[in-house]
Amino acid sequence: MRKKVLEHYLQTSTYTYAGAYGDYFRSLPDNVAELGRLVCSQVIHRVTLHEGNTNANAKLQYGDMTKFPWYRMRCEDDILMTAAAMTAELFRLDKRGFVPDRRVDNKIVVTCRYVSVLMSAILKAKNIPCRSRAGFAPYFQPERSMDHWINQYWNAEEKRWVTIDADGFYDENGMNLGQYDIADGKFDHAAKAWLDVRNGSVDGTKFLYADGLGTCSLRAVIRALFYDFHALMNDEISYQFQPCYIDNKFEQLTEQDFKELDELAMLLLSPDENFEKLVHIWETEKKYRIMNSPLVGDYDNLGRW
C-alpha cells in the first residue's frame, strides 16, 4: 500500500478527532476484536432498545432494557455527532470511562455510523490507518441488505485492509460473520450496489434504507454512495447530510446525473488504486460536497455550485 494512502487514513475529521481523549484512546486495548467488544459494551442500538429484551437481546447480552431511564432520548445520534462527544458523555455517565461492565442506564444510544466513527477515532489515535465505510449489510435480514456502516483498518503485518463490524455482539450470538475479519463479499459496498442495480444484475429492492418508509433501490443506494465517498475522504457525514443537488430531488435527477454517479462508483470500487482521482473529484466537484443538513437546506445552498 502506498504511503500517501495510509497517511491519509491516519488523518482525522471533525468527527474522528480525539482531542483531549488522544492519550485515553491510546490506552485502550490494541487487539482490535477486544477493542470492538469493549466499544460495543458502551452503546445500545436504538433498535435493540426498541425491541427490549427480545430478538438479538433475548439473552440480555446488551443488558436489561427495562432499566434504561424513561426520560433519556431513545436515540442520541442527533446529539453525539463526534467521537469526542460520545466519549465525553460516556465519562459523564460513568467516570471509569470505557468499561465492560457498564450499566444499561449509563450507556449511550447510538447507531452504526457512530460506532464506526468511534472505532475510526480510536484506531487513528493509535497510529493505525482506519476508515469508516458505508454500504449495506446482508446479514441482518433474509433476502434484504440493510444500510450499515463498518470499518476497515490497515494490518501492517499482513499488509491488507481488514474489514470489521463492531456494532453488535454478532459472533457471540451465532451469526457466523467473523465480524473482526469479515470476508470479501459478506458486506455490500455502496459502489457495487449502485452499479449492480444500475446494470440490472441485482433487484434493487434488496437494498433498504432504514427510514421506516421502505426506501430502497437507487433511492437508498444513492445515500450510501455519498456516505461512503465522504467517509473515504475522512468526512464521516451522518444520515441527514446529503448533497444539496440530490437532497429530496431524486425524481429531478437526469440520466447524465446518473452516469456521473456511475463513474464515481466505478472509482469507489477500488478506492486505493483510484485515490488520486477520487481526491481530485473531492477537491473540484462542488456539488458533491455542498451539503444539506437538518438545519442547512436549499435556501442556503442552491446556486453555490
Placement of each model-derived feature along the sequence:
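Generic structural signal for short, flexible, solvent-exposed coil/loop and linker residues
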Residues: 97, 117, 140-142
